[in-house]
Amino acid sequence: MKARGRAWKYGDNIDTDVIIPARYLNTSDPKELAQHVLEDLDPEFRYKMKPGDIIVAGENFGCGSSREHAPLAIKAAGVSAVIAKSFARIFYRNAINIGLPILEAPEAVERIETGDEIEIDFSTGEIRNLTKGEVYHANPFPEFIMEIIKAGGLVEWAKRRLAK
Amino acid sequence: MTLIEEILGGKSGESVVRRVDLVYAHDGTMPLIIEAFNKVFATVRARAYIFFDHVYPAPTVKIANLQKEIRDFAKRHRIPVIEGQGISHQLVVEMGLTENSKIVVGADSHTPTLGALGVFAVGMGATDVAVILGLGKTWFRIPESVGVILEGNPSRYVMATDVILHLLSLLKDYDMNYRAVEFFNVPFSLDERLTLTNFVVEANAKTGIIGEEYTGDGYVKELEIELNSLNPLVAKPHNPANVVPVEEVEGTKIDQVFIGSCTNGRFEQISKAAEILEGEKVAVRTIVGPASMNVYKRMIEEGVARKLIEAGAVILPPGCGPCLGRHMGVVGDGEIVLSTTNRNFRGRMGSPNAQIYLSNPITAAVSALYGEITNPEGAI
């Protein structure tokens, strides 16, 4: 599985309130949520991003509320992956559970700038910066998480457990 | 071995699958839980409760329909629904639901509040909670713990909120992600103990828990907090860890004060604020949100509600209130709020152009009287 798109870079502590403000939580329709993705951080984001683009951020991405609407909004907007130095734990679980690819890659975050063309190979964790001609590596997922990802998300993982 | 390692039965860093003794959700997170649940499961195999606290009673048809959907689901699966009686975390405590429980999961990030009762309680998202409903269990990565030992007793203007704000500034540059905080030697009442474990989430802690005796064995870090030397603190916009002494922001004009929420909406906290407002008039919009109907009832019985009403405050029905900007007390463009809640992220309470400051209920009440952020020391 691969992803390719332009990078949009933000800072540390991007919280779920700016990813999807609570005033838009009166729906669980991903398309509706996507219309407000990152609205309080960068109101232009949803107009300037193209499907496949990649969000790059610093430490503790997705901190705050447990709302699964946050990764849903990002995924439904067409973002192909989020690369961060670290993720807040509930967001980390939520993203994996709903199948939004996330990568912890501090070195990549240091180097990538907004507008860089990025290609990610999820099977190897290799992140290629086509603009700068550089290659970075994401931290590998713990074995347990890999099991869930390989199953295709938590719902599928649970189905298999039930079948046992 | 830390308290949490003992409860989860393993060493920090390990991932384990464990039975969940109690799982709960609210009107805000239930719709996505139902969606995920229905993809895989037919039967609920967990001890579950649902609370309507985020946007209750329903202000729009859309929300009324979502709540109807939740009721239908709950009825089908025989899950109790508690509507409008207060905030989930507070009600779990009041209803004694954690008795005989060691592991609790809530579909809300402030579920760790229950750690004040010595249980391991964590917040999770909708899909995780749906799977817990269906399987009765889930996986946990056993966190490393930071031991926080309190010493002495706080002065009369210092509350549990200040202990956490102080802790947030101590841990600002320390990586708390996936780690927990274990508190020891806590001199507070239950009302205030719940504030500690509720608010510690904002340090990015996975959870907080209060223990009896500190062994010192197995902790990644140890912190001592001298309560006697603490002074009232304030978190500036737009992050709870943006902490300064109240003097530094004294004189900041405010448009709204909110006293309440799962952080500071219990009887002790609201009555402390009411003592300050008694016989006075507030200078700005002042909203009080009891954490539960029991708190509200006691406020009426003990004359606290009268003091607040006569001072000009508006008392909301029990629930999350203005904390998350979805229902009552939403703030407008450019407005400045002083709130006793736990989050001051941009846009949290309404307009993304509003500014939210956080403080303890005493500072909030005194500031309501002056219409600006005021140091309670010297002012009362």
Swiss-Prot record, chain A:
Coiled coil: none
GO MF entries: 3-isopropylmalate dehydratase activity
Domain of life of the native organism: Archaea
Assigned EC number: 4.2.1.33
Pathway stated in the Swiss-Prot or TrEMBL entry: Amino-acid biosynthesis; L-leucine biosynthesis; L-leucine from 3-methyl-2-oxobutanoate: step 2/4
Biological process according to GO: L-leucine biosynthetic process
InterPro entries xrefs: Aconitase/3IPM_dehydase_swvl, AconitaseA/IPMdHydase_ssu_swvl, IPMI_Swivel, LeuD, LeuD/DmdB_bac, LeuD_type2/HacB/DmdB
PANTHER family found in the cross-reference section: 3-ISOPROPYLMALATE DEHYDRATASE SMALL SUBUNIT 1, 3-ISOPROPYLMALATE DEHYDRATASE SMALL SUBUNIT 2-RELATED-RELATED
Matches recorded under HAMAP family: LeuD_type2
Function: Catalyzes the isomerization between 2-isopropylmalate and 3-isopropylmalate, via the formation of 2-isopropylmaleate.
UniProt similarity note: Belongs to the LeuD family. LeuD type 2 subfamily.
Quaternary structure note: Heterodimer of LeuC and LeuD.
Stated name of the protein: 3-isopropylmalate dehydratase small subunit 1
The organism of origin for this protein: Pyrococcus furiosus (strain ATCC 43587 / DSM 3638 / JCM 8422 / Vc1)
From Swiss-Prot, chain B:
Keywords tagged on the record: 4Fe-4S, Amino-acid biosynthesis, Branched-chain amino acid biosynthesis, Iron, Iron-sulfur, Leucine biosynthesis, Lyase, Metal-binding
Reactions catalysed according to its record: (2R,3S)-3-isopropylmalate = (2S)-2-isopropylmalate
The record's free-text note on cofactor binding: Binds 1 [4Fe-4S] cluster per subunit.
EC number: 4.2.1.33
Chain ranges passing through the membrane: none
Lipoprotein keyword on record: no
Residues involved in [4Fe-4S] cluster binding: C262, C320, C323
Record-level Gene Ontology MF annotations: 3-isopropylmalate dehydratase activity; 4 iron, 4 sulfur cluster binding; metal ion binding
Pathway assigned in UniProt: Amino-acid biosynthesis; L-leucine biosynthesis; L-leucine from 3-methyl-2-oxobutanoate: step 2/4
Cofactor annotation: [4Fe-4S] cluster
Entries under Pfam families matching the protein: Aconitase
One GO term of the biological process aspect: L-leucine biosynthetic process
Superkingdom classification of source: Archaea
HAMAP family: LeuC_type2 (MF_01027)
Its job: Catalyzes the isomerization between 2-isopropylmalate and 3-isopropylmalate, via the formation of 2-isopropylmaleate.
Family: Belongs to the aconitase/IPM isomerase family. LeuC type 2 subfamily.
Subunit structure: Heterodimer of LeuC and LeuD.
This protein's name: 3-isopropylmalate dehydratase large subunit 2
Species of origin: Pyrococcus furiosus (strain ATCC 43587 / DSM 3638 / JCM 8422 / Vc1)
